[in-house]
Amino acid sequence: MSSLNLDDFSDLIERPDGGVRRDAEARRERQIVPPGSLGRLDDLGEWLAAAQSAVPVRPVERPRVVLFAGDHGVASLGVSARPAGSADQLVRAVLEGASPASILARRLNVPVRVVDMALDCEPDALPESVVRHRVRRGSGRIDVEDALTLEEAEAAFRAGVAVADEEADAGTDLVVLGDVSVGGTTAAAVLIAALCGTDASVVTGRGGLAIDDLAWMRKCAAVRDALRRARPVLGDQLQLLAAVGGADLAAMTGFLLQSAARKTPVILDGVVSAACALVGQRIAFRAPDWWLAGQNSGEPAQAKALDRMALEPLLNHGVTVGEGAGALLALPLVQAAAALAAELPEKPEELEAGEGPEAAEESSPEPENPEALAE
């Protein structure tokens, strides 16, 4: 039996400050550019002000990319275009600066943190800072067995909470959240199908590295079989993550919830982070107010999850590579929204009150005797 009480998060997590958001909206009304003319950037600036409890909004100066990594046993069925147990190679590419996410992060001057939760490699193959939270080597094959024991699921969840605390304590003011996994999209599809009450075929996508039709059918069958195992434990989110999630997904769920509790905004990347967010919403319904959907990855399960959480993706560029790359592309939009909200000047007071030059002209009294003046 787990000693973790997930219900505590419902009490710990508050919505972003509604009063501050109204103040931000009022300030926006006073600025020289008409309200609404900046599109979603207006909404983003007001959301960020509420998250920060600050008007004018502060710039996003210390963002961080946090990637949770793990291998999934279900990949051995040929449901991924990548070899089973090869996620450590992707992690090395990130650490060496050769992955799309690390290249983008370098360009945007954003540090990247990788957290190994269940990579299928020897722990000494990677730096201690990467592997210190590892729960196990690989996750179980979810179509026929649990991904984790309940104790492992709790340990992974608590690790995610600890990472969120470390980031908040270090002054990180926004997190770009992603995953580095092989087989992770299959587990994510199962979680989303279970929580949304949909069939396997509706949520099964092609994955980050697109698979062919035969692999898609194998993936769909794996999702269907895992879904049967998920339904009996739907009422217990930790049991659900143990049954059909994985150590990386359990950790991401804990990370998302604790980030919301610590009032750290998070940009979600693809279907894996969306699945963890959906589990988090089931635990604490106010938590999604602290998250942004960075992009539409094209995975049908992601669309289902975001719709359920009422999150609209900021970008739609078809980025399927994972590793937080799509969400990273949305970061400059958030930073731009903050800059515009904070730095656009306000209208002069006389113009706001309708007392500008034109108004003064209109209100000037007519001379009493124009003819006398003419003489």
UniProtKB/Swiss-Prot annotation:
Coiled coil location: none
Composition bias type Acidic residues, residue spans: 351-375
Disulfide bonds: none
GO MF, one example: nicotinate-nucleotide-dimethylbenzimidazole phosphoribosyltransferase activity
Signal peptide annotation: none
EC numbers, comma separated: 2.4.2.21
SUPFAM superfamilies registered for this protein in UniProt: Nicotinate mononucleotide:5,6-dimethylbenzimidazole phosphoribosyltransferase (CobT)
Keywords, comma-separated and alphabetical: Cobalamin biosynthesis, Glycosyltransferase, Transferase
CDD domains: DMB-PRT_CobT
Gene3D superfamilies membership: 1.10.1610.10, 3.40.50.10210
InterPro entries: Nict_dMeBzImd_PRibTrfase (IPR003200), Nict_dMeBzImd_PRibTrfase_bact (IPR017846), Nict_dMeBzImd_PRibTrfase_N (IPR023195), Nict_dMeBzImd_PRibTrfase_sf (IPR036087)
Pathway: Nucleoside biosynthesis; alpha-ribazole biosynthesis; alpha-ribazole from 5,6-dimethylbenzimidazole: step 1/2
Annotated region (Disordered), positions in chain: 344-375
Active site: E323 (proton acceptor)
Superkingdom assignment: Bacteria
UniProt GO BP: cobalamin biosynthetic process
Similarity comment: Belongs to the CobT family.
Function per UniProt: Catalyzes the synthesis of alpha-ribazole-5'-phosphate from nicotinate mononucleotide (NAMN) and 5,6-dimethylbenzimidazole (DMB).
Family matches, as NCBIfam families: cobT_DBIPRT, PRK00105.1
Protein's name in the database: Nicotinate-nucleotide--dimethylbenzimidazole phosphoribosyltransferase
